[in-house]
């Protein structure tokens, strides 16, 4: 995959194409993609990918459904790698795991693409009851929600009209 930056809006620093990356595209990056698609303007192109392709994680569906979101909005989510992304023109890559950050920096070293690292815990390291494990996934969801909401305010969807 080559990662090139488009010229659309880039001069004013507002991303028009965002890629979220993690290790396997099964938890953190698809969760961030779903949240971003719900919070950001619909004309922002948003995708997610992993360094490797993992397996879908049902806990992600559970914690997203709790807030009215779904990975399966238009088609079932299938974890994918960078090579499987159809459109590779991103002007912002948000990495959520150290390995993904290193890969993104390597891929973009000769491109005008902004790469930012948002350290995000891997909820699969938490053991215990089902509820304890779900709490770890909720923490990741809420962490990503706050980061996207705070750091991408200029491209947020306008609030619904009241009345």
Where are these regions (language model features)?
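Short polar/charged helix/loop
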Residues: 2-163
């Amino acid at each position: 995959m080559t990662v090139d930056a488009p010229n659309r809006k880039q001069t004013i620093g507002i991303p028009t194409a965002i890629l979220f990356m993690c290790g396997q595209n099964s938890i953190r990056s698809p969760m961030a993609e779903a949240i971003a698609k719900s919070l950001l303007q619909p004309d922002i192109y948003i995708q997610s990918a992993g360094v490797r392709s993992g397996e879908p994680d049902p806990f992600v569906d559970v914690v997203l459904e709790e807030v009215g979101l779904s990975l399966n909005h238009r088609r079932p989510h299938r974890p994918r790698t960078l090579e499987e992304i159809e459109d590779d023109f991103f002007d912002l890559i948000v990495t959520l795991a150290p390995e993904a950050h290193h890969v993104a920096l390597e891929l973009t070293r000769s491109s005008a693409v902004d790469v930012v690292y948002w350290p995000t815990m891997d909820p699969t390291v938490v053991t215990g009851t089902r509820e304890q494990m779900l709490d770890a996934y909720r923490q990741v969801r809420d962490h990503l929600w706050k980061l996207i909401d705070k750091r991408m305010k200029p491209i947020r969807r306008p609030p619904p009209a009241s009345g």
